[in-house]
Design a protein with these regions (language model features):
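Glycine-rich, low-complexity intrinsically disordered segments
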Residues: 1-107, 111-151
């Protein structure tokens, strides 16, 4: 059992890796919607029955990619978002990659699935990014157009 003094340790394994031409953070868009058209491929690891896990995914137009910000070192409790006009914000109120657990998520356009490869567009991830999970984007539950924004 965990407590505030001894948090639960969680171990994750990558299910695959993102492949594209973006090698450094300055090359990538800050958000997937700002990366319109940016092509990439998710290469899933062989020998784990992922072929079966991919069944029916090709029928979805958008998917969520859950990933690890593998180039980050450390985290910051306060960050300066690019659009902030009022200074630093608590990291949990931002989309900053500098988090206690550097987990990211991006909604990307799924072009096609071929074997263990998912061809995607509109991605803000870098080459070699470890992919932790893939989920379909379900508009009626994932979109909240009436939601307000903070700051």
């Amino acid at each position: 059992m965990s407590s505030p003094d001894s948090p639960t340790v969680v171990t994750l394994e990558a299910i695959g890796y993102l492949r594209n031409a973006l090698a450094t953070r300055v090359e990538a868009a800050r958000q997937p919607r700002a990366a319109a058209g940016a092509a990439a491929r998710i290469e899933l690891l062989p020998g784990r029955n992922f072929e079966h896990a991919l069944e029916d995914l090709a029928s979805w137009e958008l998917i969520w990619v859950i990933f690890w910000f593998h180039l980050n070192s450390g985290w910051r409790p306060k960050v300066l978002p690019p659009r902030s006009t009022t200074g630093r914000k608590g990291v949990f109120s931002t989309r900053s990659p500098h988090r206690p657990n550097p987990i990211g998520m991006s909604a990307v356009r799924l072009e096609r699935v071929e074997g263990l490869n998912l061809y995607i567009r509109d991605t803000d991830m870098l080459d070699g990014t470890p992919v932790l999970d893939i989920k379909p984007y379900v508009a009626y539950t994932d979109a909240h157009p009436d939601a307000g924004t903070g700051w």
